[in-house]
């Protein structure tokens, strides 16, 4: 542990780009969705977006096929309804007053068209696993081939064995950001070793001929999951790309178009929080000239961009963000050195604090959190940093285990508990670092390997893996747990870790460090974890277009499906205010939107139904 005062930068410029929507009087939109044979359809996603607007509102039908939007600004709206295996139904509504829009959904007649609609988790589930060999290949697809994108993007296409081999040839020379690094490092050993058999496996599943895949559609949302309302806020194209306003033809809103490409020019939306006034803030980790963090007015959709100067005329990049109990937004910022940014939403003033040059900097896949003593914690490549906002001092905590024959323990997620301790995930090494806030000591928690998938590895493969060095986060060993991002219960002594490859949440007692794995249904893969006031753990599934909530008391999961296909959320955060519905913020990295999901009670739905009937 090492302490040092921070260098403070106050000459931070705020460069704004304003994209505003006009405000009008509110009206109610409701209706009924039925199948082509006249039967009511529950759990159908119904979305509405005003002409020229940037906010898409989505709700779900109840068991009777009825849906009720919250009050919407007056205007002319595009309205559409969709469900897996059904064609997208499109309509329009004039909300100068309350309006109704009914739909009849026609079934898909083409299995390939249905497949194109699917989220990544259903695509992965459909991959064959009839033999141990198929099980090993499916494991590689589930981990290595989804390390930087959802499975629904590549697998919505069909290629023969040579085609899939060419794709693997490219991807084994790409890093976790999708950048080609063939001239800078050796190819990914795991893809290189398995290239021939993996290409054959993918060609059998998604080749030009008959497919070995068996798709099982899940039940549509019902109960609480069908009562929520989503507001999705478009983040604008980067003006410096000089593209027409209609450049993006697929943003994931119409599932029949498939999963969109991540190459949508715009601000990289990575982490997001609602401030205490209910407006959004998001981080940008994509190189650009205009924004470090962005602000979205949730009433109008107005976007305002704030720039901290970075190297070579670019904006300083950021990645992680948190909101402390006082409502202050903290984020990592790299202006040539890795530091912390502080923003007061009330004044929109930014200050940047930099560690001394001889101390480790913020870096890695940075996550930011606060502890119960008022300190801010952030990822550092080789451990974590703690920042004392009062003393304006940084303290460095170094990982005990860092470089190993199987890879380097670069920090991914970071979290802090109510006792003032910090935690960081060495994703490559299945290790959680622990920083003792009182003594400054460092310990570590080793996560047990995934024995089920480890047992599938052959003797020859095991010899290869004994010397295999993972070049990045997205090239894991078959038995890896993959601790990625995490969160603590601020009202208890529990750390929840999202194990992406193990498909579980690791529940860790912050006092005893005892570990218990809580598995997600269907091997769905968690990313980050946030804990609410009821001690429930929320996790965003970047490859499944959903967010899930785990109730430790009932040992039960609730899944909330997102309205956008290929959303790829990398973070989840909560806003819980007295007397108001819980809101969940979800930044869509692939689709370049930020969503707010609001939990609604049945009483609220009933009240809307009465108003709509007038």
Kindly give the residue locations of the regions a language model identified.
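Beta-rich, blade/repeat-based domains predominating
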Residues: 242, 263-276, 311-325, 358-373, ...
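Short, acidic Ser/Thr/Gly-rich low-complexity loop/linker segments typical of extracellular
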Residues: 51-66
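Structural motif
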Residues: 30-41
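A short, solvent-exposed loop/turn motif at the edges and junctions
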Residues: 52-54, 76, 80-92
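Blade-level signature of beta-propeller repeat domains, shared across WD40, Kelch, NHL, RCC1
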Residues: 563-614
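Conserved beta-strand positions in repeat-built beta-propeller and related beta-rich domains
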Residues: 274, 282-287, 329-336, 376-382, ...
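The canonical Cys-X-X-Cys-His
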Residues: 141-152, 198
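Structured interaction patches on ligand/partner-binding surfaces of diverse proteins
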Residues: 84-101, 106
């Amino acid at each position: 542990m090492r302490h040092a005062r921070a260098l403070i930068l106050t000459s931070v410029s705020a460069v704004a780009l304003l994209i505003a929507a006009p405000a009008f009087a509110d009206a109610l939109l409701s209706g009924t969705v039925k199948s082509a044979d006249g039967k009511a359809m529950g759990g159908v996603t119904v979305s509405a977006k005003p002409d020229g607007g940037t906010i898409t509102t989505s709700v779900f039908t109840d068991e009777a096929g009825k849906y009720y939007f919250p009050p919407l600004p007056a205007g002319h709206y595009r309205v559409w309804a969709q469900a897996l295996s059904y064609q997208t139904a499109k309509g329009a509504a004039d909300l100068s007053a309350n309006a109704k829009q009914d739909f009849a959904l026609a079934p898909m007649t083409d299995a390939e068209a249905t497949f194109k609609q699917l989220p990544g988790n259903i695509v992965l589930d459909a991959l064959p696993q009839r033999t141990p060999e198929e099980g090993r290949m499916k494991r590689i697809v589930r981990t290595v081939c989804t390390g930087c994108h959802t499975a629904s993007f590549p697998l919505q296409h069909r290629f023969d064995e040579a085609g899939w081999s060419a794709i693997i040839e490219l991807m084994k020379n790409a890093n976790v950001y999708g950048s080609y690094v063939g001239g800078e490092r050796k190819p990914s050993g795991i893809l290189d070793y398995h290239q021939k058999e993996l290409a054959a496996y993918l060609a059998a599943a998604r080749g030009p001929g008959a497919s070995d895949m068996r798709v099982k559609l899940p039940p549509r949302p019902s109960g609480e999951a069908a009562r929520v309302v989503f507001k999705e806020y478009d983040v604008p194209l980067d003006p410096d790309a000089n593209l027409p306003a209609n450049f993006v033809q697929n943003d994931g809103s119409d599932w029949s178009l498939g999963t969109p490409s991540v190459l949508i020019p715009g601000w990289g939306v990575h982490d997001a929080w609602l401030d205490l006034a209910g407006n959004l803030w998001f981080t940008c980790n994509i190189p650009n000239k205009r924004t470090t963090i962005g602000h979205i007015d949730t009433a109008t959709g107005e976007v305002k961009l704030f720039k901290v100067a970075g190297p070579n005329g670019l904006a300083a990049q950021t990645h992680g963000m948190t909101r402390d109990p006082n409502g202050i937004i903290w984020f990592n910022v790299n202006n040539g050195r890795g530091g912390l940014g502080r923003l007061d939403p009330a004044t929109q003033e930014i200050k940047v604090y930099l560690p001394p040059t001889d101390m480790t900097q913020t870096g890695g896949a940075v996550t930011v959190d606060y502890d119960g003593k008022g300190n801010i914690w952030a990822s550092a490549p080789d451990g974590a940093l703690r920042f004392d906002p009062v003393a304006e001092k940084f303290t460095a905590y170094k990982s005990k285990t860092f470089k190993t024959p199987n890879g380097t323990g670069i920090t991914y997620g970071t979290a802090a508990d109510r006792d003032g301790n910090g935690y960081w995930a060495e994703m490559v090494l299945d290790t959680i670092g622990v920083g003792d806030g009182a003594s400054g000591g460092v310990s570590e928690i080793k996560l047990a390997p995934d024995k089920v998938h480890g047992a599938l590895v052959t003797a020859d493969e095991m010899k290869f893996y004994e010397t295999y060095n993972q070049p990045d986060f997205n090239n894991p060993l078959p038995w890896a747990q993959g601790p990625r991002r995490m969160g603590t219960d601020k009202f208890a002594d529990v750390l929840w870790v999202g194990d992406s490859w193990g498909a579980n949440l690791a529940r860790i007692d912050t006092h005893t460090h005892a570990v218990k794995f809580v598995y997600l249904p269907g091997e769905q893969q968690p990313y980050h974890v946030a804990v609410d006031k009821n001690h429930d753990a929320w996790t965003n599934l970047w490859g499944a277009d959903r967010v899930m909530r785990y109730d430790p008391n009932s040992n039960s999961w609730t899944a909330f499906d997102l309205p956008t296909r290929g959303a790829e959320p990398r973070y989840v955060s909560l806003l819980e205010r007295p007397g108001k519905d819980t809101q969940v913020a979800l930044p869509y990295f692939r689709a370049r939107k930020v969503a707010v999901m609001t939990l609604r009670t049945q009483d609220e739905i009933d009240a809307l139904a009465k108003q709509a009937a007038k």
